[in-house]
A protein has these predicted regions:
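Active-site proximal loop and beta-alpha junction motif in alpha/beta enzyme cores
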Residues: 1-214
């Protein structure tokens, strides 16, 4: 949205576009990458780390075994306007086999856990990337998003909170969309300042369709 506004409504030289959304005003910035492509970044609104769940509770809902889930960090709900569950997995094989079962999820939904599930692991398709992920959500059945900005933002807060990396400042490349044949790359920057998570999510814009109203 911000890229379209900058290209067609605002000045193309604008360094920042601010989007007024339900969660508040979201700043979006633009920068050139090393390969001369343009990266678009949004700054996440404040996030809340909520209730946690167990591998035993979640494994069946994803068609996995308990041994597929990385129990070094909890399964946790993260919120910023919308909410999603962050689920750490041990392997890319487990990631590929993941599939959200809404019937099995009904008990968790009754406990207040949203049927929006972001699964990730440390194994990647390409060595220059850091994590691989999938995002499932309910929409007349189960759908899968090929690139999820808010999911990546939630992940950033989660990784900082649980000290998944030794540094308090993160710069991470996340693969997504391979299972739906739309491979995507999502960039994540995150840092802690006191008790506050500062998270930005970026990616390349690739125009695919253009129309004209007559």
């Amino acid at each position: 949205t911000a890229w379209v506004i900058r290209q067609h409504l605002a000045s193309s030289s604008a360094a920042e576009i601010r989007l007024n959304l339900e969660v508040g005003q979201v700043p979006v910035t633009f920068e050139s990458s090393d390969d001369e492509k343009e990266l678009v970044w949004f700054q996440s609104p404040p996030m809340t780390l909520g209730a946690t769940s167990t591998a035993e509770s979640f494994s069946e809902t994803l068609g996995l075994s308990v041994d597929d889930i990385d129990t070094r960090s909890p399964i946790q709900m993260i919120s910023a306007g919308t909410s999603a569950m962050i689920v750490p997995l041990l392997s890319q094989d487990a990631l590929r086999r993941s599939k959200l079962d809404l019937a099995a999820y009904s008990t968790l939904a009754a406990d207040g856990f949203p049927p929006l599930v972001y699964v990730f692991c440390n194994e990647t398709h390409h060595p220059e990337n850091d994590l691989c992920s999938r995002f499932f959500f309910e929409a007349h059945g189960v759908r899968e998003d090929p690139a999820t900005g808010n999911g990546a933002a939630f992940l950033g807060a989660y990784l900082l909170q649980h000290q998944a990396y030794p540094d308090s400042t993160l710069s991470i490349r996340i693969e997504q969309g391979y299972e739906v044949r739309r491979p995507s790359l999502v960039m994540l920057r995150a840092r802690m300042e006191g008790e506050h998570h500062h998270v930005s999510v970026g990616g390349y814009v690739i125009p695919t369709v253009q129309g004209e109203l007559l």
